Amino acid sequence: MATGGRRGAAAAPLLVAVAALLLGAAGHLYPGEVCPGMDIRNNLTRLHELENCSVIEGHLQILLMFKTRPEDFRDLSFPKLIMITDYLLLFRVYGLESLKDLFPNLTVIRGSRLFFNYALVIFEMVHLKELGLYNLMNITRGSVRIEKNNELCYLATIDWSRILDSVEDNYIVLNKDDNEECGDICPGTAKGKTNCPATVINGQFVERCWTHSHCQKVCPTICKSHGCTAEGLCCHSECLGNCSQPDDPTKCVACRNFYLDGRCVETCPPPYYHFQDWRCVNFSFCQDLHHKCKNSRRQGCHQYVIHNNKCIPECPSGYTMNSSNLLCTPCLGPCPKVCHLLEGEKTIDSVTSAQELRGCTVINGSLIINIRGGNNLAAELEANLGLIEEISGYLKIRRSYALVSLSFFRKLRLIRGETLEIGNYSFYALDNQNLRQLWDWSKHNLTITQGKLFFHYNPKLCLSEIHKMEEVSGTKGRQERNDIALKTNGDQASCENELLKFSYIRTSFDKILLRWEPYWPPDFRDLLGFMLFYKEAPYQNVTEFDGQDACGSNSWTVVDIDPPLRSNDPKSQNHPGWLMRGLKPWTQYAIFVKTLVTFSDERRTYGAKSDIIYVQTDATNPSVPLDPISVSNSSSQIILKWKPPSDPNGNITHYLVFWERQAEDSELFELDYCLKGLKLPSRTWSPPFESEDSQKHNQSEYEDSAGECCSCPKTDSQILKELEESSFRKTFEDYLHNVVFVPRKTSSGTGAEDPRPSRKRRSLGDVGNVTVAVPTVAAFPNTSSTSVPTSPEEHRPFEKVVNKESLVISGLRHFTGYRIELQACNQDTPEERCSVAAYVSARTMPEAKADDIVGPVTHEIFENNVVHLMWQEPKEPNGLIVLYEVSYRRYGDEELHLCVSRKHFALERGCRLRGLSPGNYSVRIRATSLAGNGSWTEPTYFYVTDYLDVPSNIAKIIIGPLIFVFLFSVVIGSIYLFLRKRQPDGPLGPLYASSNPEYLSASDVFPCSVYVPDEWEVSREKITLLRELGQGSFGMVYEGNARDIIKGEAETRVAVKTVNESASLRERIEFLNEASVMKGFTCHHVVRLLGVVSKGQPTLVVMELMAHGDLKSYLRSLRPEAENNPGRPPPTLQEMIQMAAEIADGMAYLNAKKFVHRDLAARNCMVAHDFTVKIGDFGMTRDIYETDYYRKGGKGLLPVRWMAPESLKDGVFTTSSDMWSFGVVLWEITSLAEQPYQGLSNEQVLKFVMDGGYLDQPDNCPERVTDLMRMCWQFNPKMRPTFLEIVNLLKDDLHPSFPEVSFFHSEENKAPESEELEMEFEDMENVPLDRSSHCQREEAGGRDGGSSLGFKRSYEEHIPYTHMNGGKKNGRILTLPRSNPS
């Protein structure tokens, strides 16, 4: 912080002088002064220096004002400021709420020098509510970083692409705008007007503004960055930002290239030079800057030079300055970097001060080293001072307690001594308590031209080291008697050393045992012990003082060793020694030992020290091979790849690979996979290599032992992205804090977790190759509890020695699992020198025809039309055969399928077909193994004779049915009479009912009554057909006119549904049945029935005309690339909310009418002329969108992509299952009617949803709609909301007309009476939803095998769904006949 302040203070006088020179040249283009860069902090005092500034030549930093309040800024405004040449930084300025008054005319930020790649930084401005830089038109270089501003809004309304050339590197996060809490209102919006220009970003066509009162200025595209006038006319090509007149370079607000004498120019003509990348100056201007800096000798100023037609602060790399003309000339060889020291000397008292001399080769002045502490000093000093080759003055080392050696001056070769310390000293060393070495004189050469040496009070620096320096530096004989103190230098060091020799060395893989010769000083009591030093040394170039300083930084490991017991007999004297433990295998260590002795009375210190020796530990077992990956490229081969061990612990010579075939689980033989609901087992072979990390499985979640969903570790890409994001933020903050004050310590955290949810499934499939490290075993244990019996030869392990990191294993059985063991070895013979094993499982690919049935299919025909089919099993299938599929058909009929389990096949040696009708049959069979289906056999033909041909059966055939018909008639008549008495006909007469007639086929309707015309009947003459609209379920749908069909309207546009002329009676009844269902519906958000024409042919049903067709087609037409796009943009959030509420209101009405839709989808919703969405007429769309349906087994078509899990699994349809479908409709609205679960087949969707899956969030989906979807897709039906609750959630954001027409706000929407809730189940009315006669109801209720499809509806619909902790009480049970294929 202090450093930055000093630099700014030093540079200010020079730049103020520059500003004065430019005042006359500024002209009208810049109305004020050119000011130097400013750092304004702590208070507002210096802010007034901006008052007359038009250009800030440098940066503007406003920061660290914690006591300012909003009223302090109200009278502050600097309208003259137009351009900042570097960057603008605002950081922790309290009370500042907007910049609109502070810098109302700031137009350009050039970004010549950036703040961490950013030209505009707004960081931790706690009170800033808006930027307000409404005249900012151009940021020439750099990006924008706006972060951690808790009150900052109006960010989404700024189109940064109009200000910057590229917005990809912008970083705008963690502001109030991120939380969607901002109510950004552009000028005119509150009054319903559009005053500001609108642009498209990320598909959003939005107005652009800086504040509620200032629009963002958007120039025509052809103007590019030149700007435009207030009328929108383009400025001159040399302008930047704005201008007052078009096509005039003297009327620009700022210049695109350079400014010269009141006009903008492309380049500076001679004799002018480019200065600061924006203006032109002459030679005298640049020369004045050079001389003023040189003469002032102030820190932080620059001695400007001329290079490439530019006036720049210093010569670039590879050039040096010619002092006569200030020109930069190329260097001959390496360029010296001369650093001129202010006041002739510089004191290095910290790493920070040393950094200021980084890169210097010549010091023009004297250096004083006075370092008393610090971290990692030796390395830091070498990095910053290691290139210094020459010092013109003197070198003084004073009270530097942290220094052990001067070897960090690794290139210092000359001390000139042009300036000497008092007493004529050019090298001065005083009171350095830990200095032990000057330089390694065997490798270093130093010359001192003038001056003497001074050494006093360096207690650990031996005199021999000083005398060696005298000889090398050429100063011997210059010193006087008292210049080198004999008593205070080296008085605490072992300077008269003897050489210790090692007598015994023994190694193992993690230990080294050392012994050395005994040593005793003249007084043996002076020996305190030995010090053993060792460290890893890949190369034999280590010196004793490498990396050492006196503050604890030491690259050596030091061990203190007590002296041995002294013996009077030298021959029996024990040799001291030490066992070094915990070493790394196969690693070279540098080792030396020296004595630790006391200070002697004779001022002489004795001691001994060994030379540095190098010892390597032995090899041992390597660590496990890394990342083994297996793939199968054929049915008989597996490719194995791996990486070398992380710790080879020796030279890896080879790898051992073992593999063994794994038996399939015999339990698979015992199960009957033809049973409904039993999942077919499957196995997959090892997939091809995708990357080196393909063995890692990046599932989003897994199930634990209790079957509960657990979060999985994040994928490598997620972790890498989070680490990069965290590192990026930390690096920026460190950079910011380094510039602003002091660098903070790096946090030990791993970074913030991503709060966004990353998973969409509640369950997980099987996992593929998994690698684990286990101890080596001689034979592989069998992992299956029970196995298919196979010969021991097939399962014997195989072994192979490999000399590289890959292997192709051949000769394997097709589609068979193998377990592979991999060991790394670093020696040829002993087995114990190999690593523990890494295991990987793999499976070969299936054989193409291995599952084909061998030989012909034979048959045998028995009585009662039973046929026994027989065939042979595949000889060598892919894994196991789990079932057989038999496909047979009678000539002229549909093909039928029969599943035969393996257990059943083993008993029958085939299967039996029973109850066959007479005729010619063909049959095909295929086997299903763990790998999938085999091929069908060739068809086999047989003939079943007519059962009537047997005379003895004629009587049974005739008499039996007669008895059955008689009994059946009696039962039906009794039931009919009973129900007739208990329940009179409804007001609409007999009724065929269906909860969704689309899935009730004609075969389910017993036609014992006909349609009876009523008040809905319309005369055929009143209907006029105009044009075809499309094909419906029963026939064509037309647009037409109807006269007098609605009271008060002479003629009404309607939709007319017809039935095909070839339709059967049952189809016509079903057609009218649909119309009858619609008669009971009178809701604005449900398509209305207007009338029926049942007299004559064809039958017509007249409906309300929905001008924009079905919702699915309408949404697709809104896609930008759609050919039939009506010119409307995609729906906004407000329009999505309106659609959702209208659909929910219609469904709430149907629910109140005890109607379960069962096929709610966008295709079944219709769009009216005023864009109101209504629930469709339940019959127009299934044939049109037939691909949206799926036939499951022998059932009718099912819309599986819209169905709830309980409907798919158990056939249960309730209002809760309709709510699930409503969530899918919301998904269709936000995705513009994409197909749900795109890329999955219907069978995959079926399994995915039943297993707990649901749809991903569409791109750019509003968070509010996403929340609604998730509410609808609760796996537990009881936890889903009701449609009334949905409308209640959205009611405050709907069109004002909604309450006038909605069911939600109507009198009809009332809670049921309390006595109705007390009904017992026996007393409840069984209400089928198909309008049918009573006889049809009775038959449906008593039909054999007619499994009913039940659903519940709660009367407690006004209780929020989040409180439904138990089952729904007092529910009404309604039974329906199961739908059959239509």
Swiss-Prot record:
Outcome when changing residue 1180 to I: In a patient with insulin resistance
Which SMART domains does the record match to this protein?
FN3, FU, TyrKc
**Substitution effect: residue 878 to S:** In RMS; impairs post-translational processing
Result when mutating residue 835 to I: In RMS; impairs post-translational processing
One example of a Gene Ontology biological process annotation: positive regulation of nitric oxide biosynthetic process
The effect of residue 1201 to W is:
In LEPRCH and RMS; reduces insulin binding possibly due to reduced receptor levels on the cell surface
Q: Which reaction does it catalyse?
A: L-tyrosyl-[protein] + ATP = O-phospho-L-tyrosyl-[protein] + ADP + H(+)
The record, for CDD domains, names: FN3, FU, PTKc_InsR
Q: Highest taxon of the source?
A: Eukaryota
Binding site residues for ATP: 1033, 1057, 1104-1110, 1163-1164, 1177
Effect noted on mutating residue 279 to H: In IRAN type A; interferes with receptor processing
Q: What is the effect of changing residue 1189 to F?
A: Reduced interaction with GRB7
Q: What is the effect of changing residue 167 to L?
A: In IRAN type A
Record region (Disordered): 686-708, 746-766, 1360-1382
For this chain, the site of the Glycyl lysine isopeptide (Lys-Gly) (interchain with G-Cter in ubiquitin) cross-link is: 1079
Assembly and interactions?
A: Tetramer of 2 alpha and 2 beta chains linked by disulfide bonds. The alpha chains carry the insulin-binding regions, while the beta chains carry the kinase domain. Forms a hybrid receptor with IGF1R, the hybrid is a tetramer consisting of 1 alpha chain and 1 beta chain of INSR and 1 alpha chain and 1 beta chain of IGF1R. Interacts with SORBS1 but dissociates from it following insulin stimulation. Binds SH2B2. Activated form of INSR interacts (via Tyr-999) with the PTB/PID domains of IRS1 and SHC1.
Please state what the protein is called: Insulin receptor
What organism is listed for this UniProt entry?
Answer: Homo sapiens
